[in-house]
A protein has these predicted regions:
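Sec-dependent bacterial lipoprotein signal peptides
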Residues: 1-5
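A sequence/structural signal for flexible, mid-protein segments enriched
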Residues: 7-256
């Protein structure tokens, strides 16, 4: 009888979700001496099939030192890195440390995304070292000096053979506990003699640091019923995404 009563009490509840309102998604990284490239897409509902919705009518403008350039819609893949872009301008900007650069993206739906970035200085890598254990496996140690007069944020990456492949290490950090000190990033005993490693140290803005952390949180929460939903922390206004500059030092070493 109790089982029958329990069955009678079951009800199907239909949850009505608000309609998804698509936003412009912008990703643009400035590199000194490199052409201007950007990705502009459109957000889709979580329940939609995976897709990359292009926005052909989106216009991208970048302003530096009072001069504005327009990035043309011209989708392509960078053969070196394997990354895709939707807009480009082939002439690099003459970027100096401390320069402020702005971006504006708009389309025919009257959507508008804006953002700004301040060009940072590169932080030199002082040493890339390795040491073998008794099993002939080596760990990697990368060292640099933190500036005591600034609040600094870093991204550290290592690749094997090519930056076009997935990174072996990729993490962000700040100098709250290491301000003004010599900082060293280590690894596990992952390497052997003859391995070619590409080490990259990025000096990044706090906005990019927060963006990367939020991306990591969102990946960890995706599909996990026990995780809190995670919101992407954007550096742009009016949409989703990141506009920043990449100031990095890169070294290639062969483990010997």
């Amino acid at each position: 009888l109790l089982l029958l009563i329990s069955c009678d009490m079951e009800q199907e509840v239909e949850i009505k979700l608000p309609p998804h309102e698509s936003q412009l998604v912008v990703e643009c990284y400035l590199e000194p001496g490199k052409p201007l490239r950007a990705v502009v897409l459109e957000s889709v509902s979580y329940f939609n099939n995976p897709q990359l919705p292009l926005v052909p009518d989106a216009e991208v403008f970048i302003t530096h030192n009072g001069q504005t350039v327009r990035l043309a819609f011209s989708p392509f893949q960078d053969r070196k890195t394997g990354k895709y872009f939707t807009h480009r301008y082939n002439k690099p900007l003459d970027l100096k440390t401390g320069d402020v650069v702005t971006i504006e993206v708009k389309d025919k739906k009257d959507r508008r995304v804006t953002g700004s970035t301040t060009i940072l200085n590169r932080v030199p890598i002082e040493a890339v070292e390795w040491k073998f254990n008794e099993k002939e496996k080596a760990y990697l140690l990368t060292s640099f000096q933190d500036d005591p007069d600034a609040e600094n944020y870093y991204r550290y990456m290592t690749h094997r053979d090519s930056i076009g492949h997935g990174s072996q290490r990729d993490f962000v950090s700040n100098d709250k506990l290491t301000n003004g000190k010599r900082v060293s990033y280590g690894s596990s005993y992952d390497y052997e003699k003859g391995d070619t490693l590409i080490v990259s140290l990025y000096h990044i803005e706090k906005e990019y640091y927060d963006f990367l952390n939020s991306i990591s949180d969102a990946k960890n929460a995706n599909g996990n019923p026990f995780a809190q939903p995670s919101r992407i922390v954007s550096s742009v206004q009016g949409g989703i995404g990141i506009f920043t500059n990449l100031a990095y030092e890169r070294k290639t070493v062969i483990i010997q």
